[in-house]
From Swiss-Prot:
This is ATP synthase protein 8. Keywords: ATP synthesis, CF(0), Hydrogen ion transport, Ion transport, Membrane, Mitochondrion, Transmembrane, Transmembrane helix, Transport. InterPro entries: ATP8_metazoa. Pfam families: ATP-synt_8. It is found in: Mitochondrion membrane.
Length: 53
Protein backbone atom coordinates (compact mmCIF):
# COMPACT_ATOMS: atom_id res chain seq x y z
CA UNK A 1 0.00 0.00 0.00
CA UNK A 2 1.62 3.30 -1.04
CA UNK A 3 2.20 6.04 1.48
CA UNK A 4 1.54 9.74 0.96
CA UNK A 5 4.51 12.07 0.80
CA UNK A 6 4.66 14.87 3.41
CA UNK A 7 4.14 17.52 0.72
CA UNK A 8 0.86 15.83 -0.19
CA UNK A 9 -0.31 16.02 3.44
CA UNK A 10 0.67 19.69 3.53
CA UNK A 11 -1.20 20.39 0.29
CA UNK A 12 -4.24 18.51 1.58
CA UNK A 13 -4.16 20.51 4.83
CA UNK A 14 -3.86 23.81 2.93
CA UNK A 15 -6.77 22.94 0.63
CA UNK A 16 -9.02 21.94 3.54
CA UNK A 17 -8.01 25.04 5.50
CA UNK A 18 -8.79 27.37 2.59
CA UNK A 19 -12.10 25.59 2.04
CA UNK A 20 -13.00 25.94 5.73
CA UNK A 21 -12.07 29.64 5.82
CA UNK A 22 -14.07 30.34 2.65
CA UNK A 23 -17.08 28.45 3.99
CA UNK A 24 -17.01 30.36 7.30
CA UNK A 25 -16.56 33.74 5.65
CA UNK A 26 -19.38 33.08 3.17
CA UNK A 27 -21.68 32.11 6.05
CA UNK A 28 -20.65 35.19 8.02
CA UNK A 29 -21.20 37.66 5.20
CA UNK A 30 -24.41 36.06 3.90
CA UNK A 31 -26.22 36.72 7.21
CA UNK A 32 -28.50 39.75 6.94
CA UNK A 33 -30.12 40.84 10.21
CA UNK A 34 -33.69 42.12 10.14
CA UNK A 35 -33.69 45.89 10.27
CA UNK A 36 -36.33 47.52 12.49
CA UNK A 37 -39.40 48.77 10.68
CA UNK A 38 -40.04 52.47 10.26
CA UNK A 39 -43.10 52.27 12.57
CA UNK A 40 -40.98 50.89 15.39
CA UNK A 41 -38.41 53.64 14.92
CA UNK A 42 -41.11 56.32 15.14
CA UNK A 43 -42.48 54.79 18.34
CA UNK A 44 -39.04 54.71 19.91
CA UNK A 45 -38.47 58.38 19.07
CA UNK A 46 -41.90 59.46 20.34
CA UNK A 47 -41.61 57.58 23.63
CA UNK A 48 -38.26 59.04 24.61
CA UNK A 49 -37.89 59.84 28.29
CA UNK A 50 -37.78 63.48 29.35
CA UNK A 51 -35.89 63.84 32.60
CA UNK A 52 -37.23 66.55 34.89
CA UNK A 53 -34.79 67.38 37.66
Amino acid sequence: MPQMAPISWLLLFIIFSITFILFCSINYYSYTPNSPKSNELKNINLNSMNWKW
